[in-house]
Amino acid sequence: MGANKTLNMKKRFGRKIKQNRPLPNWYRYKSDTNIRYNSKRRNWRRTKLKIY
């Protein structure tokens, strides 16, 4: 991908960057939740984004 990106593309990349992080520990320690990890985590080598 080149260096020139449109604003919409940058927005999408920003959103994907924010989504691609682990759960906060305080949320994991809450008593009424069964969620242990972020199942939608993405690795930059394995799964590519469908943004062109």
UniProtKB/Swiss-Prot annotation:
In the UniProt record, does the keyword Heme occur?
no
**Keyword set, alphabetical order:** Ribonucleoprotein, Ribosomal protein
Any one GO MF annotation of this record: structural constituent of ribosome
Q: PROSITE patterns from the entry?
A: RIBOSOMAL_L39E (PS00051)
Q: Does the keyword Manganese apply?
A: no
A cellular-component GO term for this protein: cytosolic large ribosomal subunit
BP GO terms, sorted = translation
Q: Which domain of life is it from?
A: Eukaryota
The family assignment reads: Belongs to the eukaryotic ribosomal protein eL39 family.
Q: Which PANTHER family does this chain map to? A: LARGE RIBOSOMAL SUBUNIT PROTEIN EL39, RIBOSOMAL PROTEIN L39E
* Name of the featured protein: Large ribosomal subunit protein eL39
